[in-house]
Regions:
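Solvent-exposed soluble domains appended to multi-pass membrane proteins
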Residues: 1-246
């Protein structure tokens, strides 16, 4: 891979590092890289077949990463570490394969590029009812939640909230591609505003997860409110304003 080593040797290196200090607490970040372009799984794996060769390679690379994570969990259990280790599986972005004429992930705020998985594994979570969190959450909530699960109080200055809290919340986001896109996700609605072109999009992502029906002209007041909120936020970004004439 152009970014690093295959996932198998990477996980083995993580375990070797853990084995060097068996009595010490540890924090390890394992960055699976086979799912990054050009999506090459090692060893080669073909469990999924699609008409799009790149998409097929990607799906099989994800499957291989899944198998490597399962192997890691088995190795932690064999070392007696499974009951003392909080494992988090997530991602820094999604990946697009033609949705909205977009590929990869760098220049889009559509769900295919920004929706990521989040799985947490630890025996202490047995007291937390297993459930799928349907409300809006952000990665900024993850450190806050992990520290709370470990029995510590997050610093007051930290942003984020407990992932398991019941209330819904609002998420702001943006992408600095050729046409900068800002957005807000609140409940079922997701709003996109393209700074350079002024184009707006509003989607009901529960009824329309593929973001195919733009509701902006049908709900102008909602768009006005979301644009106003973003305007208040970017006032704290003077360089951003100068660059885009906002």
């Amino acid at each position: 891979n152009s970014w690093g080593v295959p996932d198998g040797p990477m996980f083995q290196a993580v375990l070797d590092w853990i084995d060097e200090r068996p009595e010490q607490p540890f924090f390890a970040l394992a960055y699976t890289i086979e799912t990054h372009h050009p999506y090459v799984a090692e060893p080669p794996l073909v469990e999924f077949q699609t008409k799009d060769e790149k998409h097929q390679r990607y799906l099989n690379a994800v499957r291989n990463a899944d198998q490597q994570i399962a192997w890691l969990m088995e190795q932690l259990a064999a070392r007696g570490l499974a009951d003392d280790t909080l494992v988090v599986i997530t991602a820094d972005h999604g990946e697009s394969f033609g949705q909205h004429n977009q590929t990869v992930h760098s220049f889009s705020v559509y769900e295919s590029a920004v929706h990521v998985p989040l799985v947490m594994l630890h025996p202490a979570l047995k007291n937390v009812p297993q459930r799928r969190i349907e409300q809006v959450r952000q990665q900024v909530d993850l450190p806050y939640t992990l520290v709370s699960l470990l029995g510590c109080r997050p610093p007051d200055a930290w942003q984020g909230q407990d992932l398991f809290a019941a209330e819904d919340r609002r998420a702001y986001f943006f992408s600095t591609g050729n046409n900068v896109a800002c957005g807000i996700r609140e409940g079922q609605y997701k709003y996109h505003f393209y700074i350079d072109s002024g184009h707006e999009e509003l989607f009901d992502v529960l009824a329309d997860p593929g973001e195919l029906k733009n509701l902006a002209t049908e709900q102008p007041q909602r768009c006005d409110e979301y644009r106003r909120r973003w305007g208040g936020l970017i006032q704290y970004q003077p360089g951003f304003l100068r660059r885009h004439g906002a």
